[in-house]
């Protein structure tokens, strides 16, 4: 395992390629959890992610003979771009194997950094196997996305930057996927300040670290289901698990709904965009069992496409009670839409969408279903709409988040 001086040497090594992402104080997230919250915005890092730190550190430490052989990696996202840029800066050939259906924007970004891209397989595991075949055939050096001491060492430089800027930080919240970033940050932070608390945050639908800790060894998850695709890892690494067991104080999980809510707050209040995996620590703030502490949330990346941004904002509005969707059964006769409009106006609700469906009910000749989506300003406003309809003799059915968000 790495020592403090190893992380300090890595920090010097990375000065030629990375930027120091300055901490941002967050009033809104502080209010949400009752702590003094700072954001470490690695979404503003070169390539849009922390991954370049570990990739560059690994490749820069190769021997001249290894550099001459070239490097290879398998990735559908941030690791690909980190390896590609690091290799380009160091004048080394890089080959990246990506699943065939990787979004074109990520493929092109990786190519622009100078790497040769090989598209293979439907999922990451198939791309990984292809990368292993090419490594054996061509003698490339494989750069693992997380289960590698040199990669972990590079990611740990984030902790040194945080503690240089905020030496009295009490808690660090770090995303967990394969475990590389939490391993590096936890080790470097604890070696620098043994009293600091490090908490890993992983998706409920991809809790590979918790599963490994319970079994005391890495185990594959039966299913991975999360919107945090960058941390949707079926099995954590062996090396990273040892770091987690030694240095990480706690692992917590967050739901997709909590990610949606955190995304909206980050965009709305800080004018920052981050990928779903990157906001895991922000979503985990409400689950802290402490108050009044200085907490740093590591926002690890910002590579997210425009359509996903739009979807996350809309879903965040639903979760925060800013959009309310409900259904109401109406007599199938003229004038009912007017009555509904009057009740919505009385409740100061601005209509976004109406769906008047005569065929939803079996007895369509007697009543029809109207589904309504309105803008609201929170739960109190939603309740006032419900009460307004009730006093006028209408019973409305509130659609729950899963019904709305699955559409």
Sequence positions of predicted segments:
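PLP-dependent amino-acid enzyme catalytic core
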Residues: 1-407
